[in-house]
Amino acid sequence: MNKVKYEHLLASVLKPARYINNELNSFGKTPSDNCVNFCLAFPDVYEIGFSHLGIKILYTILNNEEDAVADRVYAPWPDFGKLLLEEDIPLFGIESSIACSNFDVIGFTLQSELTFTNILYMLELAKIPLLNTKRNEDDPIILGGGPAGANPMPLSIFFDAFLIGDGEDA
């Protein structure tokens, strides 16, 4: 899996620290063909999503498994999203810099209906077909879960499956 080259864009955005892996306690496991590669997606900016307890729990559980790797991705601010589109650079995991489209599974946290449009924006930036009927076996499985997923119908044409209840128990 090749890393996305995006560093040249950082000087052009308001808060570049949103897009680099500069956190304490991150696992730093590298996605590979020998394990299931998860990208945990939070459809809001880094400053909102990094403190979300549910993502932290799933991230820790998955990375403690021998045969799994979990990375994270957050919705970019419009300045960075625009540059990604202009430069034809796909949205990527914050730790590995691997394109989201190269992961096996992308799991979106559905905290509020207000972030549903951000999910579609993130799929577009990741160069993943929006409609589940347009995706094939080379595309990641798109999962959703969280409080706003209690009624999955509004997003059912975009997701492959939903987890109802606590993700760590699924």
Which ranges hold each PLM region?
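Glycine-rich beta-alpha loop elements in corrinoid/cobalamin-binding modules
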Residues: A75-A170
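ER/secretory pathway lumenal C-terminal domains and tails of membrane proteins involved
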Residues: N2, N22-F27, T60
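Short acidic, S/G/P-rich loop/turn micro-motifs used as interaction or catalytic elements
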Residues: V45-I48, E113-T115
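N-proximal accessory regions
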Residues: N2-H8, Y46, L123, P140-I142
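Short boundary motifs at domain starts and secondary-structure transition points
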Residues: E23-D33, S96-I98
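Helix-enriched interaction subdomains in cytosolic or periplasmic regions
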Residues: M1-P16, E65
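Low-complexity, highly charged intrinsically disordered N-terminal segments
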Residues: F38-P43, G49-T60, N64-L84, D88, ...
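Sequence-level motif detector for i,i+2 pairs with an aromatic at +2
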Residues: D33-C35, D139
